[in-house]
Swiss-Prot record:
It comes from the Eukaryota. The gene is AQP2. It comes from Milnesium tardigradum (Water bear). Gene3D superfamilies: Glycerol uptake facilitator protein (1.20.1080.10). Pfam families: MIP. It is a multi-pass membrane protein. This is Aquaporin-2. Keywords: Cell membrane, Glycoprotein, Membrane, Repeat, Stress response, Transmembrane, Transmembrane helix, Transport.
Amino acid sequence: MCISEGKMDWRSWLRKKFQVRSQLLRGCMAEFLAVFVLMVFTEGCSASAIFTHRRNDLLFAAFGSGLAVTMAVYVAGGVTGAFLNPAIAVAFSVLGKLPWKNCFCYMIAQYLGAFLASLAIYAQYYDALNIFDGGHRQVLGDNGTAQIWSTYPQAFLSPQGAFVDQVFGTALLIIVVLSMVDKKNWKPQNGYFPIAIGLLIVVLDISLAYNAGAALNPSRDLAPRLFTYVAGYGTETFSVKGYTWFFVPVVGSHAGAIVGAVIYQLFIGAQWPQDDLDDSNSVSSMSIHEKNFSLAKRKNTRNFNLDITRDFKERNGISTVLY
């Protein structure tokens, strides 16, 4: 047996034994893995910045975050569209583009992926942490390392300013994302979509990260914050700013995503001619997958699950959605 045949036999065995039939569960698995990749790269870049005394280097952080998002979108883009962000998923559900059941399941997967990625980075840099802080975990200060995992606001930032910061940044994020996935707009081709999203994150970080790090993603902030609490950083991970900060990246991001979705629909989406408002503005990628899966079951199509990504792109022309 040749090597190539051996590989095919191994892949066929793996598919037979472990392929998941539920499209929803497949989506959750993809979101989990993609967010894990996103957070490992994002937190890894933050760790490198802190250990090399580049804590305030916005360009370093911005390009690291942008490239992390690009890689993560490539991971799950063909399966779910790569939401990667509970706030984005909620916004798409509000617009009727993602079933609420899928939204909630994806959110759980995203938080789990972010938490386990935080554990992975802690293990990866455990020795470096001990050298840097002498084994005494600190949240803030010269030897503080909690910013590897979560965002913390500048001392001058008020609670009101922090909330506006998160709403404004996430609204801009979703406005541009919706423009990229709108069939009637100048959306990038699927293969270039992750690059475009990465560039969006770069410019958002450069322009808006000074106040509080531009979290713009609840799973990117809350799950790692929970991890740092468990890992020995103490209650200061939540008590910073008198307990007026830790919930802002969660609530503000969700609010901002919904605001941004409404703004895009008002100024762009609702302005297309009525003839152009076809199913591209009302159907989600996952709902299309589910319809195809049901049809395949009725027709007893044995090979339906072998290449759902290619079927998704060629038959439906839908691009990935993010983030």
